């Protein structure tokens, strides 16, 4: 290595450097290096740890996601109970005065005594968590549970980028950081968009999505849900000099690199608390996360001890929630918004109504099925709620106030073409969501289309990440994937966090991507329901892009594993002239791949057989095993089903193994796979009951 002959020293340096960049990016929101440079550092650390496994440490950034799913969540007893905070029943300013009066009476303070000093914080709508650090390293994360006993969720919490795996600076022997795991609203919306895109159930609100992620048995599921964290207190600690005030404690936690909310304020007496409450009420709609109130705490720790607890609630703290947020108004019309995945979402246009401190004029109606289920019609009086305490939602109509029989809203009849780009709008038979078919062309879908196109398994354009794509699209430098191949050094070098060197690296990566394969190119187009495996099947079957473009639904269904739904998605994609125009622009930009005659029927020792790979194989990576199977005519799927012929199981095989056993799928290990590929016959030591010993 250029700077360190000692791999251990270099690994330690990389871990510290990556941790600093993570803290700057995820906690401070002030990125310090380009994405491509961060990726380079991360890969270098991965390479060192792969070559020297003995250097792997639990606080390494490479270890945030990993390991097999757990069989169950293990109970954890809290050394210091995680108690709940009393909720003030009076949501008005009088509720604040009631709390202050109780505190003063408990402390024996009279009218002539000084005002009590308080710290005001936000009441986050998330999941309470306890993070235990020993000598600075995160060793356990546990849910609140019943306050006495929670559940060990360390495997999932390690995937949260905001939570440091190692504390900054000189850390105490033991410190348990208490706080809230939550999901930002924009992350929640993006997650639900992905759920809709995959045909999966959407989440009701960010809190449910966050809580469900934290309690998953498989950390890979949690890693796919973008979670955040704020600290607000302390549990057990040893070797830690406890500050004199709650405010100082939060400052100390922030110095350890733990995220602490900036919206907090020290004040004296009830009037300061009331002012904070009202100021946050006016601000809450602009916050990037959900809150359902504020929390007041006596600031001095010695007074907290003196006040103590009553019925397992601290006397020195109270939650002050905001009032209920439902009102009635008239539905003036229904508009449509096009999301980044092409989903058309109906939006209620409302007569202005004041709900929970803000004036609401629009609210989500989700999709056609929800409109039908709620029977909401233009002209109705409707109940409006700020769902999740933030996002306005139409709950339903007030039927007794309906006049006559207003017509029902039909999205496809009202919007046969995309309101953004004019492409055809389509909706699958069993799908709730209608979509714009102009995926490569539609401005609303540009960012998502570009990120998918540049992905590692698509065109593999290294360095083209979220932030850069956002800049390129917002500055109107790139409108379609074809525009990437027109980029020059001047246009890139002027972008934020993109110097001349980074620009040259990106241009080199774009140039390298011109030489690809037909399968990668098809996958990069982002055709709905066309994954990597289907793209390979299409490339193999048709042999050329022109043959694919000319295929109708009937011809497409001749491709192995392409059924009516996928065939319809492909046909609709290429029936949209805007998409074909971008495809031709990409060809004109010099993208190249080998083409040939349509493939003959698959041959080889496992031709026509479907495999699923799970667990860690002794000598083969999953990609290597997949390539071997495909080279012998087989196909690799990502999930076990009745159509699966063989499950290739390695160490720490997860839920796929159990499902394969339930379905009676043949199970082989790596040796069994090699024998199968060589002879086409299953080894007699492998069977449907499990992996051979």
Curated annotation (Swiss-Prot):
SUPFAM superfamilies for the chain: BRCT domain, DNA ligase/mRNA capping enzyme, catalytic domain, Nucleic acid-binding proteins, RuvA domain 2-like
List of residues binding NAD(+): 35-39, 84-85, 121, 144, 180, 297, 321
Gene Ontology MF term list: DNA binding; DNA ligase (NAD+) activity; metal ion binding
CDD domains: LIGANc
Keyword Transcription listed: no
Enzyme class name: ligase
Keywords assigned by UniProt, alphabetized: DNA damage, DNA repair, DNA replication, Ligase, Magnesium, Manganese, Metal-binding, NAD, Zinc
Annotated PROSITE patterns: BRCT, DNA_LIGASE_N1, DNA_LIGASE_N2
Gene3D superfamilies according to UniProt: 5' to 3' exonuclease, C-terminal subdomain, 6.20.10.30, BRCT domain, DNA ligase/mRNA capping enzyme, Helix hairpin bin, Nucleic acid-binding proteins
InterPro entries cross-referenced by the UniProt entry: BRCT_dom (IPR001357), BRCT_dom_sf (IPR036420), DisA/LigA_HHH (IPR041663), DNA_ligase (IPR001679), DNA_ligase_AS (IPR018239), DNA_ligase_CS (IPR033136), DNAligase_adenylation (IPR013839), DNAligase_N (IPR013840)
Domain BRCT: 601-690
Catalytic function, reaction form: NAD(+) + (deoxyribonucleotide)n-3'-hydroxyl + 5'-phospho-(deoxyribonucleotide)m = (deoxyribonucleotide)n+m + AMP + beta-nicotinamide D-nucleotide
E.C. number(s) listed in UniProt: 6.5.1.2
SMART domains xrefs: BRCT, HhH1, LIGANc
Binding site for Zn(2+): 418, 421, 436, 442
A biological process from GO: DNA replication
Active site: residue positions: 123
Function recorded in the entry: DNA ligase that catalyzes the formation of phosphodiester linkages between 5'-phosphoryl and 3'-hydroxyl groups in double-stranded DNA using NAD as a coenzyme and as the energy source for the reaction. It is essential for DNA replication and repair of damaged DNA.
Name used for this protein in its record: DNA ligase
Organism: Azoarcus sp. (strain BH72)
Gene this protein is translated from: ligA
């Amino acid at each position: 290595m250029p700077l360190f002959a000692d791999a251990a020293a270099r690994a330690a340096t990389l871990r510290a450097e990556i941790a600093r960049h993570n803290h700057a990016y995820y906690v401070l929101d002030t990125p310090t290096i380009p994405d491509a440079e961060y990726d380079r550092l991360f890969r270098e650390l991965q390479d060192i740890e792969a070559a020297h496994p003995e250097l792997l440490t639990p606080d390494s950034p490479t270890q945030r996601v990993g390991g097999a799913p757990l069989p169950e969540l293990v109970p954890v007893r809290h050394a210091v109970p995680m108690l709940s905070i009393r909720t003030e029943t009076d949501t008005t300013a009088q509720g604040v005065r009631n709390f202050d009066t109780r505190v003063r009476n408990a402390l024996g303070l009279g009218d002539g005594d000084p005002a009590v000093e308080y710290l005001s914080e936000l009441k986050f709508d998330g999941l309470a968590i306890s993070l235990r650090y020993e000598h600075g390293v995160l060793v356990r994360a546990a849910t609140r549970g019943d306050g006495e006993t929670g559940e060990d969720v360390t495997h999932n919490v390690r995937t949260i980028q905001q939570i440091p795996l190692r504390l900054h600076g000189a850390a105490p022997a033991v410190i348990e950081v208490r706080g809230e795991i939550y999901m930002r609203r924009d992350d929640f919306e993006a997650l639900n968009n992905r759920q809709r895109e995959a045909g999966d159930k959407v989440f009701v609100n960010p809190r449910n999505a966050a809580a469900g992620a934290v309690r998953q048995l498989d950390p890979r599921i949690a890693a796919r849900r973008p979670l955040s964290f704020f600290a607000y207190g302390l549990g057990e600690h040893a070797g830690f000099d406890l500050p004199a005030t709650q405010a100082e404690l939060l400052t100390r936690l922030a110095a350890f690199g733990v995220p602490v909310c900036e919206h907090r304020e020290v004040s004296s007496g009830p009037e300061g608390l009331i002012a904070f409450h009202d100021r946050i009420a006016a601000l809450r709609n602009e916050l990037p996360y959900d809150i359902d109130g504020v929390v007041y705490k006596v600031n001095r720790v010695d007074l907290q001890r003196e006040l103590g607890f009553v019925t397992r609630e601290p006397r020195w703290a109270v939650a002050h929630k905001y009032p209920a947020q439902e009102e009635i108004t008239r539905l003036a019309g229904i508009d449509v918004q096009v999301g980044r995945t092409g989903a058309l979402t109906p939006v209620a246009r409302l007569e202005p109504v004041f709900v929970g401190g803000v004036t609401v004029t629009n609210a989500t109606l989700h999709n056609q099925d929800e409109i039908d289920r709620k029977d909401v019609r233009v002209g109705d009086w409707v109940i409006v709620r700020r769902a999740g305490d933030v996002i306005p939602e139409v709950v339903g109509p007030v039927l007794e106030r309906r006049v006559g029989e207003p017509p029902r809203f039909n999205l496809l009849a009202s919007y046969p073409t995309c309101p953004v780009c004019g492409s055809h709008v389509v909706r699958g038979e069993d799908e709730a969501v209608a979509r714009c078919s102009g995926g490569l062309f539609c401005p609303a879908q540009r960012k998502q289309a570009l990120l998918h196109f540049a992905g590692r398994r698509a065109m593999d354009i290294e360095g083209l990440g979220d932030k850069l794509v956002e800049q390129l699209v917002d500055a109107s430098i790139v409108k379609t994937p074809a525009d990437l191949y027109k980029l020059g050094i001047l246009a890139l070098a002027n972008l934020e966090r993109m110097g001349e060197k980074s620009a040259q690296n990106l241009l080199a990566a774009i140039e390298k991507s011109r030489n690809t394969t037909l399968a990668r190119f098809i996958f990069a187009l982002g055709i709905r329901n066309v994954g990597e495996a289907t793209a390979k099947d299409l490339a193999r079957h048709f042999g050329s892009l022109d043959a694919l473009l000319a295929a109708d639904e009937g011809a497409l269904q001749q491709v192995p594993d392409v059924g009516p739904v996928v065939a319809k998605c492909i046909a609709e994609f290429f029936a949209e002239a805007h998409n074909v125009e971008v495809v031709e622009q990409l060809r004109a930009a010099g993208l190249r791949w080998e083409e040939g005659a349509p493939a003959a029927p698959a041959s080889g020792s496992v031709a026509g057989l479907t495999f699923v790979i799970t667990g860690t194989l002794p000598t083969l990576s999953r990609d290597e095993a997949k390539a071997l199977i495909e080279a012998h005519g087989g196909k690799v799927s990502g999930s076990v089903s009745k159509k699966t012929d063989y499950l290739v199981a390695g160490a720490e095989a997860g839920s796929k193994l159990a499902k394969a056993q339930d379905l009676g799928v043949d199970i082989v290990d790596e040796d069994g796979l090699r024998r199968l590929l060589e002879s086409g016959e299953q080894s007699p030591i492998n069977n449907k009951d499990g992996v051979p010993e």
